[in-house]
């Protein structure tokens, strides 16, 4: 599970994939994207326009309170 505890913290995509999937990171490259989509569905008021789980293109995700 990904723990996001600091506002403005960028969760680097490849770092998190490697932590979750180890050496099989390439095989699971869509896992984090799907996981973030599920988090948005559950926690955002409007998942199509997220305010808390922001995608940083080419970098990863930003969690904002």
From Swiss-Prot:
Residues 1-65 bind DNA. Transmembrane segments: none annotated. InterPro entries: OmpR/PhoB-type_DNA-bd, Sig_transdc_resp-reg_C-effctor, WH-like_DNA-bd_sf. GO terms for molecular function: DNA binding. Keywords: DNA-binding, Transcription, Transcription regulation. It comes from the Bacteria. GO terms for biological process: phosphorelay signal transduction system; regulation of DNA-templated transcription. This is Putative uncharacterized protein YbfI.
